Amino acid sequence: MAPRSVTPAVLLALALLGAACGSGSEDGLRVVTLGDSVAYDADPGIRAALEAITTGVGSGVEVETRSFGGIGLLRPGFDDYLAEVLDTQPDVVTLMLGGWDSDKAMADPESYRTRVDEVTRRIIDTGTFLVWLGLPPTPPEEDAREHLILVNDLISSVAGRHRNVAYIDGSLLGDARGEFTRTNIAVDGTVQQVRKVRNGEDDGHLCPAGAALLGEAVAEVLLIRGVVGVEVGDPEAGHPQGEWWTGEWTLDPRYDDPPGACSG
């Protein structure tokens, strides 16, 4: 079943792309994840989900995670950062950005839309498929809702104009109304903490259960793209850590930064 965060138009575009691409090459599918500190927390979950997939030729998916804090489309060094990635000729790039750009995006939305389109074209013109990850809801105390909605709307509108681009709505980490929530229904159907706690207050960064939800959404998009094999999460996937959402990656030190962040 397709995730609720993927629009029907995107699913149709991905299905058409999958028909053109077939089942992948003998070298497997190469994916690079890019983004800021929230994406950094998402990276292990995305990698675990994707590496639990086998392609049609059984060669699997290789994921390189390259997210780090403080990066944005308008931040110094972004173009060089992107160039380094594209030089490796990935098949797929995932991109979650915008938090560090929000003030300038609010000041001049059309200029930011142009920048999003420029970066999008730069990626897909190399033959790479792009998955934009929308920014997830932020805690009300951060007073960033208006900024987040604007940035996500600009990115999703650009994504919708390009055939080889998918947009995944970050509200999949939210509650039934798409608003911030510390806990949510996890991949395995249980209620788990998906967002961090910092100094006793809600924080926008991710816990393993939140990272796994994003990983599942990306994996399902790429399955529709034409990566065939077992469905993500199936125990028969042959993932070395068993059920991918409970693997060793969930013990990564980033999920205990600050200490106790994901046990509150």
Please tell me what each predicted stretch does.
Residues 99-100, 121-152, 171-172:
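Active-site segments of SGNH/GDSL-like serine hydrolases
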Residues 22-24:
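Bacterial signal peptide processing site
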